[in-house]
Amino acid sequence: MIPKKIIIMAGGSGGHVFPGLTIARYLIEKGWLVNWIGTKNSIESRIIPKYGIKIHYISIKGLRNTSLKNLIISPIYILRAYYAVKKIIKTWSPDIVLGMGGYVSGPGGVASWNCNIPLLLHEQNKIAGITNKWLSRISTKNMQASPGVLRNAEVVGNPVCQSIIKVPNPINRFKNRTGLLRVLVIGGSQGSSILNRILPEVSFLLKEKIIFWHQTGNYELEKTKKKYNKLRLNQNLITSFIKNIASAYEWADLIICRSGALTVSEISIVGLGAIFIPYPHKDKQQHRNAEDLELIGAAKIIDQSNLNTKLIVNILNSLDRDKLFIMAKKAHSLGVRDAIFNIFNVINKISKKT
């Protein structure tokens, strides 16, 4: 039997790349051949090749918060990227092209449509990004993590890796747990400057109550470590990137983090109370992602403009392990654990029509 082939388009941020990688690895297990389209010097260029997946690089940038100069020359980059992806499609002849949202998906989505290759989209967020909004008008099939985001889209959930799904539930994790409250701090795959600045101060004021496992991002590791060391806070674990995030979730009583779609999905699947500081996009995309968990009492949302040391200290002082256990159970009730199977069924069904 000739194996099916798929091109996955995702790049720029972990929120697009990691769900795409989960899908890619599952498809490979099922005998599919996978190629990837991304950009150089970005998260996908560092991660995807490690899994033996061939990645093709295109030159394209996002338009959000860009300069006037970049806006003027952006059509040139888009056109070049379009022809680059079209050449890849013509050469490799995939059965399916899957766009995970973000600027990397744009040129390839149009190229696949122009080449009459089925275009599938997956939207992770509660508010669709610009690229997926545009491409949803020409796509063969739309998938979404939550209802009502893209037109005529099937709700499938967000795919997460099996190691996260296998994390013990809150009842088993919190059983007989004692000692300092364990707080996981993650600013997304790139880290977060504001959390790196504030959390050492919080740790100093609550050093008798809290221990942090803090992901700083690659660029601020040494700077953040110096802040902790200056305050003589040696009990905390400070790292640039947590490779085994499942073990970190299993360890934690609470997480302080951004509210990217994948992070929110993972927290729900694991069952973990959260303090969310949404990235302040104009469309409040991350705020919307976190609202369901806040609504059921599993999380608190703090706008970045209101974030300060005193506020975090007051919230943490109001919590104990019993309260965090209740928050964790509430979060666990919203977890979607079969997303990868739902997505595979959609891909497989469309591929049989080609």
UniProtKB/Swiss-Prot annotation:
InterPro entries: GlcNAc_MurG, Glyco_trans_28_C, GlycoTrans_28_N. GO terms for biological process: carbohydrate metabolic process; cell division; cell wall organization; lipid glycosylation; peptidoglycan biosynthetic process; regulation of cell shape. It is found in: Cell inner membrane. The keyword Cell division applies. It catalyses: di-trans,octa-cis-undecaprenyl diphospho-N-acetyl-alpha-D-muramoyl-L-alanyl-D-glutamyl-meso-2,6-diaminopimeloyl-D-alanyl-D-alanine + UDP-N-acetyl-alpha-D-glucosamine = di-trans,octa-cis-undecaprenyl diphospho-[N-acetyl-alpha-D-glucosaminyl-(1->4)]-N-acetyl-alpha-D-muramoyl-L-alanyl-D-glutamyl-meso-2,6-diaminopimeloyl-D-alanyl-D-alanine + UDP + H(+). GO terms for molecular function: UDP-N-acetyl-D-glucosamine:N-acetylmuramoyl-L-alanyl-D-glutamyl-meso-2,6-diaminopimelyl-D-alanyl-D-alanine-diphosphoundecaprenol 4-beta-N-acetylglucosaminlytransferase activity; undecaprenyldiphospho-muramoylpentapeptide beta-N-acetylglucosaminyltransferase activity. It is an enzyme of class 2 (transferase). It is a peripheral membrane protein. UDP-N-acetyl-alpha-D-glucosamine binds at residues 13-15, 125, 189, 242, 261-266, 286. Pfam families: Glyco_tran_28_C (PF04101), Glyco_transf_28 (PF03033). One of its GO terms (cellular component) is plasma membrane. Pathway: Cell wall biogenesis; peptidoglycan biosynthesis. Its EC number is 2.4.1.227. Keywords: Cell cycle, Cell division, Cell inner membrane, Cell membrane, Cell shape, Cell wall biogenesis/degradation, Glycosyltransferase, Membrane, Peptidoglycan synthesis, Transferase. NCBIfam families: murG. Cell wall formation. Catalyzes the transfer of a GlcNAc subunit on undecaprenyl-pyrophosphoryl-MurNAc-pentapeptide (lipid intermediate I) to form undecaprenyl-pyrophosphoryl-MurNAc-(pentapeptide)GlcNAc (lipid intermediate II). Belongs to the glycosyltransferase 28 family. MurG subfamily. This is UDP-N-acetylglucosamine--N-acetylmuramyl-(pentapeptide) pyrophosphoryl-undecaprenol N-acetylglucosamine transferase.
